[in-house]
Amino acid sequence: MFEDVFSDSGNTGNFDRGKKRRLTIIECGCDINMMIDLAKVADLVLMLIDASFGFEMEMFEFLNICQAHGFPKILGVLTHLDSFKHNKQLKKTKKRLKHRFWTEVYQDKVGLTHELVQSLISTYSTIDAKMASSRVTLLSNSKPLGSEAIDNQGVSLEFDQQQGSVCPSESEIYEAGAEDRMAGAPMAAAVQPAEVTVEVGEDLHMHQVRDREMPEVVEIRRSNCTNHCDLGDTSSYHTKVSTVHIMKKRNGGGSLNNYSSSIPPTPSTSQEDPQFSVPPTANTPTPVCKRSMRWSNLFTSEKGSDPDKERKAPENHADTIGSGRAIPIKQGMLLKRSGKWLKTWKKKYVTLCSNGVLTYYSSLGDYMKNIHKKEIDLRTSTIKVPGKWPSLATSACAPISSSKSNGLSKDMDTGLGDSICFSPGISSTTSPKLNPPPSPHANKKKHLKKKSTNNFMIVSATGQTWHFEATTYEERDAWVQAIQSQILASLQSCKSSKSKSQLTSQSEAMALQSIQNMRGNAHCVDCETQNPKWASLNLGVLMCIECSGIHRSFGTRLSRVRSLELDDWPVELRKVMSSIGNELANSIWEGSSQGQTKPSIKSTREEKEWWIRSKYEEKLFLAPLPCTELSLGQQLLRATTDEDLQTAILLLAHGSREEVNETCGEGDGCTALHLACRKGNVVLEQLLTGWTSWPEMPTGTQR
């Protein structure tokens, strides 16, 4: 369709719109990840879909994600190019589509810089399904219009059978008129405000309505749907708008949604002024009738209890239930739609807690007993109201997809201020190809199938959806506000892994710096080299890189070497290093080194290796044991009980495996390691585990 757009640059076309604006057109494949990435940075998305082959699953997923997260405006074009058998007709259709794109989308008539108010007027007629398909889209950027103002401007359209306006069968409505639907209705969302666009069959007429006042939403209800079209009559006739209802916006600004559907034209039999109101019949599913019928069918018990009392009962007992647990932020009865194919609504008791979890129970009794519950994690979920876009969405006119395509409700949210009334036996649709006209049998008791507008949805990151419904608009808005606040609070309380790692690295760096600042740690423990960067976990000392290589050659039994800058340092290892240090270690390992020359920075590797081997492996310079009648194992047990670190290190240096693992003569037979664990002394526990202690050795009571 836009072959000359991408002829020069492949899949991308760049066009200058002055010195400060530039339009970039990117052709995207049917890939869900690519479509989402481009939609995040785009202002407008134009979807060209071949309706003859149906929607792909990627299209449905893309529309669902766009509606849940407030992505940009989407203009959908259902193409039927394969249905054209003649090249001349195909070229003509492509030319019309191209013209509409460049004159309506490219020329900035979408309304990106000003508010675009659009209301859906056209619907399907259930009186005669064989009537010609037509579309009526009204855009108003003027003061409230009366029916005389619209009729006097001639919102009518002449068409005849020769132009393909009347289709002889139901199937041909979607096949023979493919060119008209493709070129007209899907692009109607791009028409400039202050225009009235009426399309029937092959022709497209626009009537200007000029004014400078604030925009208002105008809604038209057809009432002359009982007249039939004479398929054999070749004379032209007019489509008249019979009744006009002016609905003012209640919430001021905000973005409204775009809709598209079809309505068959009805020949006008009179040119008199239209009436301003049509009294609803008994079968008209007005909001009042629909709400009362819903309560009487779903919530009225067999004994004739009052539904208002049932609704107030959970609120009266909200403060007296759920003892022993945290008090929820909000709780009450809501309707929940089942996920099964029946799609039935059942009453659930729903609670919202401060931990970011929404829980629903089958009944109030289940909540009191804390059984049969299901939880929804709000930290990975978002909330959505059908027909109402998120507050962060900046779209001026946003599309709505059919409920059959994305599982969302078809009803509009009246909280936005736009109210749409439906005539008897009328159902809205968005795609003439996907939603065929309903049969007369399908319209029986259709008012019972009307969904309420008090519902909201919770969509998780995995795509799972929960549908809830409140009794009133106020209650629904209260739930939505509470859930949104809890989602925000939960996300703000969760620290990212990056920030956690930064905090951990900062605290670890400060702890290692404090270890280097200890007395004696400014020089190597064996050769007095300045600023050592390596450590021995068994000994609790710092050393230079050359001495660390010698320590490694002795194996991990003697010394486990670790770098201060390259390795991770858990809390327990940092405590060992900060508790011992070079000064304390040398007072033990060099306690009897009188007359021996300690290596220096200028000493050779052989001299350093001899000193380290004599000091740690042969223990030639080790301080003597204290004079006592107790065995080494009993002394180690007493030092562990008294938490005497210096004595414990000296005893560990002199002791063997059997002496270190000696148990208490009386009591439960605990070793020194067991006593250190009971005391909670991490330093002694690490030293005993690193030397010759046996952690798996059971106590005398087999614990």
UniProtKB/Swiss-Prot annotation:
<dbReference type="InterPro" id="IPR038508">
    <property type="entry name" value="ArfGAP_dom_sf"/>
</dbReference>
<feature type="domain" description="PH">
    <location>
        <begin position="327"/>
        <end position="488"/>
    </location>
</feature>
<dbReference type="InterPro" id="IPR051282">
    <property type="entry name" value="Arf-GAP_GTPase_ANK_PH"/>
</dbReference>
<dbReference type="GO" id="GO:0003924">
    <property type="term" value="F:GTPase activity"/>
</dbReference>
<keyword id="KW-0343">GTPase activation</keyword>
<dbReference type="GO" id="GO:0008270">
    <property type="term" value="F:zinc ion binding"/>
</dbReference>
<keyword id="KW-0479">Metal-binding</keyword>
<feature type="compositionally biased region" description="Basic and acidic residues">
    <location>
        <begin position="303"/>
        <end position="318"/>
    </location>
</feature>
<comment type="similarity">
    <text>Belongs to the centaurin gamma-like family.</text>
</comment>
<feature type="compositionally biased region" description="Polar residues">
    <location>
        <begin position="271"/>
        <end position="286"/>
    </location>
</feature>
<feature type="region of interest" description="Disordered">
    <location>
        <begin position="249"/>
        <end position="287"/>
    </location>
</feature>
<dbReference type="InterPro" id="IPR027417">
    <property type="entry name" value="P-loop_NTPase"/>
</dbReference>
<keyword id="KW-0040">ANK repeat</keyword>
<feature type="repeat" description="ANK">
    <location>
        <begin position="631"/>
        <end position="700"/>
    </location>
</feature>
<feature type="region of interest" description="Disordered">
    <location>
        <begin position="427"/>
        <end position="449"/>
    </location>
</feature>
<dbReference type="InterPro" id="IPR011993">
    <property type="entry name" value="PH-like_dom_sf"/>
</dbReference>
<dbReference type="InterPro" id="IPR001164">
    <property type="entry name" value="ArfGAP_dom"/>
</dbReference>
<feature type="region of interest" description="Disordered">
    <location>
        <begin position="299"/>
        <end position="323"/>
    </location>
</feature>
<dbReference type="Pfam" id="PF01412">
    <property type="entry name" value="ArfGap"/>
</dbReference>
<dbReference type="InterPro" id="IPR037278">
    <property type="entry name" value="ARFGAP/RecO"/>
</dbReference>
<keyword id="KW-0863">Zinc-finger</keyword>
<dbReference type="InterPro" id="IPR001849">
    <property type="entry name" value="PH_domain"/>
</dbReference>
<comment type="function">
    <text>Putative GTPase-activating protein.</text>
</comment>
<protein>
    <recommendedName>
        <fullName>Arf-GAP with GTPase, ANK repeat and PH domain-containing protein 9</fullName>
    </recommendedName>
</protein>
<keyword id="KW-0862">Zinc</keyword>
<feature type="domain" description="Arf-GAP">
    <location>
        <begin position="509"/>
        <end position="629"/>
    </location>
</feature>
<dbReference type="GO" id="GO:0005096">
    <property type="term" value="F:GTPase activator activity"/>
</dbReference>
<feature type="zinc finger region" description="C4-type">
    <location>
        <begin position="524"/>
        <end position="547"/>
    </location>
</feature>
<dbReference type="InterPro" id="IPR036770">
    <property type="entry name" value="Ankyrin_rpt-contain_sf"/>
</dbReference>
